[in-house]
């Protein structure tokens, strides 16, 4: 019985961490996304969209700077009364902690689901 568990464990781990299939899927998705973007550019700017590339780059850089400014605005600013800053920083830290806890809980749930599936497969193979 332990041999079956070992084989299943190594088989499932290999499938779960197989990088070639993940890379192929990501590459395929990236190619589809690139084709969609190219079609959008041709549709929006016409067949000579390459001439508009410098303007597009400037607009994208401006959007990136705005996003960076918005990201920095999310952080609490230090100023005013020290006791108000302490509460604000504490709330900000708890927000970050709860966000990380959510990620960990998701990973635990995925691990538990895969464990249950592996036990079900082993039960089906063992009987």
UniProtKB/Swiss-Prot annotation:
It comes from the Eukaryota. One of its GO terms (cellular component) is extracellular region. It is found in: Secreted. Residues 1-18 form the signal peptide. Expressed by the venom gland (anterior main gland) (at protein level). Keywords: Secreted, Signal. This is Venom protein family 16 protein 1. It comes from Platymeris rhadamanthus.
């Amino acid at each position: 019985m332990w041999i079956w568990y070992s084989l299943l464990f190594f088989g499932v781990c290999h499938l779960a961490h197989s990088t070639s299939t993940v890379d192929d899927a990501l590459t395929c998705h990236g190619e589809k996304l690139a084709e969609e973007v190219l079609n959008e550019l041709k549709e929006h700017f016409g067949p000579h969209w390459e001439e508009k590339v410098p303007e597009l780059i400037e607009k994208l850089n401006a959007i990136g700077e705005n996003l960076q400014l918005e990201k920095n605005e999310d952080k609490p600013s230090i100023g005013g009364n020290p006791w108000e800053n302490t509460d604000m920083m504490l709330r900000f830290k708890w927000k970050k902690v709860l966000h990380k806890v959510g990620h960990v809980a998701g990973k635990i749930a995925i691990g538990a689901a895969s464990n249950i599936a592996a036990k079900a497969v082993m039960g089906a193979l063992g009987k």
